[in-house]
Amino acid sequence: MNPVNYLYLAALLFAIGASGVLVRRNAIVVFMCVELMLNACNLALVTFSRMHGNLDGQIVAFFTMVVAAAEVVVGLAIIVSLFRSRHSASVDDASLMKL
């Protein structure tokens, strides 16, 4: 398969994730869309790495996935805290959590 097709797929996934972040109000859905955007960037990194014949992009994508795993833990903890305090997972309610 042509590597350019993978870049088109990465751009499509990033656009879907960006539109989900801008349109949706549910914190869990917004969080999933951010993760989709991150995975689209990883796909582009691996594709560019494969096109140029070195492993740098694949290594960066691997470390990005490790950091994303930690991000999932922190993000879900914040969403659970929001749901427990406001009984809603809406992004609009997150602004009410200020000290």
Curated annotation (Swiss-Prot):
Task: Give the record's GO CC terms.
Answer: NADH dehydrogenase complex; plasma membrane
**What Gene3D superfamilies does this protein's entry cite?**
1.10.287.3510
Instruction: Kindly give the Pfam families that the UniProt entry links to this protein.
Output: Oxidored_q2 (PF00420)
Tell me where the transmembrane regions lie: 3-23, 28-48, 59-79
What stretch or stretches form a coiled coil here? none
Compartment(s) of residence? Cell membrane
* Family membership: Belongs to the complex I subunit 4L family.
Q: How does it assemble?
A: NDH-1 is composed of 14 different subunits. Subunits NuoA, H, J, K, L, M, N constitute the membrane sector of the complex.
User: Main role?
Assistant: NDH-1 shuttles electrons from NADH, via FMN and iron-sulfur (Fe-S) centers, to quinones in the respiratory chain. The immediate electron acceptor for the enzyme in this species is believed to be a menaquinone. Couples the redox reaction to proton translocation (for every two electrons transferred, four hydrogen ions are translocated across the cytoplasmic membrane), and thus conserves the redox energy in a proton gradient.
Q: What is this protein called?
A: NADH-quinone oxidoreductase subunit K 1
Q: What is the lineage of its organism?
A: Bacteria, Bacillati, Actinomycetota, Actinomycetes, Kitasatosporales
